[in-house]
């Protein structure tokens, strides 16, 4: 971002403020000044000349010119193609040293004495990159609508065209993207030096009602990416087709190659002031009033574009296409103002491989509601050039962003956090010339936030702003003090440590994965119904822009990577937190098994991975938290995510609260990623901590031999195992435990939407050794209860 002293002088009285003081102020306010440039020192002397006569020198491309410099007339030989009589030009006289290092001397060219130089812009310090190719070999013609230049012939031309300026090149931090509007830096400096801003009230005000029925449709893939759509339009008279030299040089100092059309140039000056970009279209060139924002393939790149009847009007971030662009003959000008999701525009910038004034602002988080300020500023500029016949107010087609209106904070909260003793009066004075309004009731301060400061959303942000304006250098450095205290017992942490040790003992590897993922992936794998995603304001990549909503996908990605390097025998787990914008924080556990449960390469012993091995691990975790396993419910309902096996999956509930999921990956997904059979389980540890039984009860162990019976049943996939078990165990005595020991599926069972389960029942008693007759009698009760449910016993 570039700020110039001359631009600041239009709004602030800087008579008693030096460039060094401005430099110090910017750095003190948190804007790092990368470099400064004293343009006035680039050229020792430049004066305004008037070409009275220009004649071609025979047999050459040179012209012999008589140039009036006020006190006398100079004879100057010039080879520029555009030099001609009746032009105001920049003259470097004899003995002057100009920016390219040349010191002028009197010399003969083609036997004609040349007494100085008529200068081109690149010769006096303007970079070639911001000069059109056709203008690079031309001399510069000076113009100013407000000055009678004939009265200034022989005067210092640097003051007339703005080359007496001083530049500050500022590096903005991401949270201060609002300062891509130079008006914001203006307010900061006015506040720092306690200066009143002038000339901002000289506004054009004669806006007519906007009755233009313009439609801008949004393609489905961009509907959620467009925050704001607004437009206005102007009827122009085109009295002037050239910018004043000061404005043209100002654009070039801001690294902008000015257009040949003054209307476009004025919109760029408005963009520098407000940070809102303008898309200008000649209304008379549109085929209809129906526009569309959509992705189209242009030069083999999918770019966000504005179209009209399937014709390309504007590639967002570039100038309007020539067929629809404004020119010096345009009478009706449409002004469209957009605010677009920065991540999308960063992708657009990468595809376009350029950085310009438009894209620099599209890719940053800026107040989406700048349209009225931008339209007002643009109208002021058009009015200064007497170009407006009629101007029409802004009409809003889409507005999704609402500015944070206010924040309340107590005085002691600010002082405690910053280590200061500021008073309410002092704090109010810090914001004197900024667009903050501060009221208080006793020691409670109410801050009405500057709408451009979308980075201020919390009390901590306010405290940081107070510290910045007060100056960090004024805050006393106080070393941290540590108070020792008795550490409270944390049963949840102890259980988590036991859980970690248990999984490590089973051969699992503790894994740490990235907390950030893509927005689409966060939505797609939102297994735990997280409502308000946390998105980074400016992520380095779209792949890492949103806090994850689950741990499962992260561990699956780890498994895919390990399989790609031939590490296929995997047992992984991770314990981490899940967050959302509603202050949600959930502690989750995920574990993953892939390929074999056990593999001994010496004797070729293999135990294949299966659902019930992972379920047993899960139930052992439930036992660790002393949960009542009879309250656990398993339901199969994960068909929405295609990466999960449609049949081998379960959703787990405890007392009707969602605990988590256990599932096998879809074989197609496994095949695509070259994975062996892989099972994943993710649970919410906060629910386990909520329902854990903290009381450990010692139970008497039976001294007698237990006996078991196995039973295989066929049940419908629509019937839950818990329901079958609840009815089967009605009035059954001596039963100590039960568990599923096998699951069987074949084509016929799958066809009939059923499965075969083998359940083991264990019987024992504390008082006596059970006889076979007693055991069989209770086992028959189970069989009878199951038959009453019309469940097939195999």
UniProtKB/Swiss-Prot annotation:
What is this enzyme's class at the first EC digit? ligase
Biological processes annotated in GO: phenylalanyl-tRNA aminoacylation
Gene Ontology cellular component terms for the protein in this record: phenylalanine-tRNA ligase complex
B5 domain: which residues?
402-477
User: Superkingdom of this entry's organism?
Assistant: Bacteria
- Where it mainly occurs, coarsely classed, is cytoplasm
PROSITE patterns per UniProt? B5, FDX_ACB, TRBD
Location relative to the cell: Cytoplasm
Which reaction is the catalytic activity of this chain? Answer: tRNA(Phe) + L-phenylalanine + ATP = L-phenylalanyl-tRNA(Phe) + AMP + diphosphate + H(+)
- Cofactor binding annotation: Binds 2 magnesium ions per tetramer.
InterPro entries found in the cross-reference section: aa-tRNA-synth_II/BPL/LPL, B3/B4_tRNA-bd, DNA-bd_dom_put_sf, Fdx_antiC-bd, Fdx_antiC-bd_sf, NA-bd_OB-fold, Phe-tRNA-ligase_IIc_bsu, Phe-tRNA-ligase_IIc_bsu_bact
Q: What is its EC number?
A: 6.1.1.20
Keyword annotations: Aminoacyl-tRNA synthetase, ATP-binding, Cytoplasm, Ligase, Magnesium, Metal-binding, Nucleotide-binding, Protein biosynthesis, RNA-binding, tRNA-binding
On subunit structure and binding partners, the annotation says: Tetramer of two alpha and two beta subunits.
- The entry's protein name is Phenylalanine--tRNA ligase beta subunit
* Source species: Mycoplasma mycoides subsp. mycoides SC (strain CCUG 32753 / NCTC 10114 / PG1)
Q: Which gene encodes it?
A: pheT
